[in-house]
């Protein structure tokens, strides 16, 4: 028997329960070998810090997020902006009042007409200028078309970055149909330069209304199809529901406006709270959410597109023929027959082109409901031909500043739909 025993005196022929096998001690009583305990000691860990953007496609090329991660949980975030800073406010102070419009086009460049209209209303309020009725309706029509374009872009981009490429293509198709109509009216798809102090640049061409209504019918069909693809999509719902939540109280405290505020349950819309142009004559609803998450912010855009379609159709029904710009040649260029045929017309044209309009001295804050929320212009005039001071309240800035609060404690993957749902546009945020 002694020959059969192996190393350590263990009989290899022994089986459990047989003589010589013995009982195995419980695991808890086994003592570690020398140095083995070090393997089980808790290891100190450090949070990982990663850069998301500015070249990351989900950050739209204009924002850098320095994200601190504990595993996949976001522990903190610092935002680095300024990659698209152009000195908007100072640039506007170096040109005439009428030359500011091309700069406003490049704020929220997806819905530029709203920026045109916002600035024009501020100057007209300071100058106490009443614009023609037809110009009011044309401003509303074009603004609401651009609101639809903006929301289509957000919904399409948000779906694409969650893997639904088809929705993005549908959204871009509908947006391009609307942009084609605006290009026919304004001469540009993106940077419209359509509004003027005292009215609009040009009237709608013959047949434009009928073509626009046909395009709206097609856009309605595409929007409904997008809703069918996303509203009950399990992946989309799981990625958006209960992520990026902001309560009504927090949204107000953080300075939210627009769809993001309404998604949190606060029914504030400038078009209802402080009506401008002809919004007080129109029948439309303000959609309001209850959960304040990414899914509610998506639903806000979908419903607002439906309401914008309703507004545009009412404007076409109510709009009557008439002037599209004031006939006060201190603010608007005289018609070409007067310029070419009278000395008064030549002089008025020359002074407006060379010196710009003279806005009475004073200051004013004017605000409108842009696609992302309250767009405000603070304008100061010293009575000269250029703005003395111009300040901008960008609707997207409070939402972007709140992004670290909205994502703290959530998964890294939740950052993408949250960033998309606030619709940060670098042009308006960084100016």
Curated annotation (Swiss-Prot):
**Membrane-traversing stretches:** none
Keyword Cell inner membrane set for record: yes
The UniProt family comment states:
Belongs to the complex I 49 kDa subunit family.
Region annotation (Disordered) ranges: 1-37
Give, as one word, the top-level EC class: translocase
Q: Which GO terms describe its cellular component?
A: plasma membrane
Q: Which UniProt keywords apply?
A: Cell inner membrane, Cell membrane, Membrane, NAD, Quinone, Translocase, Transport, Ubiquinone
A GO term for molecular function: NAD binding
Q: How does it assemble?
A: NDH-1 is composed of 14 different subunits. Subunits NuoB, C, D, E, F, and G constitute the peripheral sector of the complex.
List where in the cell it is found: Cell inner membrane
Give the reaction(s) catalysed.
a quinone + NADH + 5 H(+)(in) = a quinol + NAD(+) + 4 H(+)(out)
Give membrane topology per the record. Peripheral membrane protein
Q: What does this protein do?
A: NDH-1 shuttles electrons from NADH, via FMN and iron-sulfur (Fe-S) centers, to quinones in the respiratory chain. The immediate electron acceptor for the enzyme in this species is believed to be ubiquinone. Couples the redox reaction to proton translocation (for every two electrons transferred, four hydrogen ions are translocated across the cytoplasmic membrane), and thus conserves the redox energy in a proton gradient.
Q: Which HAMAP family match?
A: NDH1_NuoD
Q: EC number(s) per UniProt?
A: 7.1.1.-
Q: Which Pfam families match?
A: Complex1_49kDa
Q: List the disulfide bonds.
A: none
Protein name in the entry: NADH-quinone oxidoreductase subunit D 2
